[in-house]
Amino acid sequence: MLKFIGRHRPSFLAVLLVANLTVLVLPVVGTYVLYRLYEGTHLVRSTEGDLIAQGAILSAAYTTSFSRILASESDRRAYGVPVNEKWRQVRDPETEPFRPIKPRLNKLRDDVYLPAPNSTTGYEPDPIAIQVGRDIQPALIEAKVVTLTGIRIVDFNGTVVATSGTQLGESIANREDVQQALEGRYTSLLRQRVTDSTPTQLGQLGRRGRVRVFVNLPIILDDRVLGVVVLSRTPPKGFEAIKELPR
């Protein structure tokens, strides 16, 4: 047995070669793991955070326009649908003035859903929501040029009343995440991105990853859901984001 081991003992050169290869491979593997974590967690959550910020501003703009159009306080209190008891937040504005929403998506952990189902037709938007939508529609279109964010604002029935693109007057209430948001719950998820064989220049800039981040922010006033801001954007690829880091 000892003779067999002696005859098959690796040479010093072979041991040195294996050790050097290990030293070379470990940094590569470590760098790859860090890259995957950066792309799958940081960039996705950064995108979600940006969408939350945009959605909060649009939600505030919507409620401001809504309060101006529907001036009667009693009418406002009867408008929309009540927030589901499960999602109602009991807080004292004096002791808890802020209500932050933290990004939570993780491409390495969360499911990636199929592209959003097609919108449906045949639904009549709420008349008040139509007026509010007309007020803020130009802002949505201008924002998309800079942020590359797809934006839809739906009324309390899930019908699109303002959009940065298409589907105006159509319903997206067939999406489960939108249904939950219409109950007053913030929802976010990852979907497979839809590719286009003949994308525009803007589309080429926007479709740089394998997934698209979707955020659904309820528009709530006096514990009643007026509608939902639906936003989506493709996070940048890791290498592109790294190139933009300050040197």
Kindly label every feature range from the protein language model.
Residues 8-36:
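Extreme N-terminal signal-anchor transmembrane helix of membrane signaling/transducer proteins, especially
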Residues 193, 205, 214-223:
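A short, hydrophobic, proline-anchored segment that marks a local hinge/packing element in signaling
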Residues 111-141, 145, 159, 163-210:
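Extracytoplasmic/periplasmic sensor domains and loops in membrane signaling proteins
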Residues 1-8:
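Short, Lys/Arg-rich, polar N-terminal cytosolic tail immediately upstream
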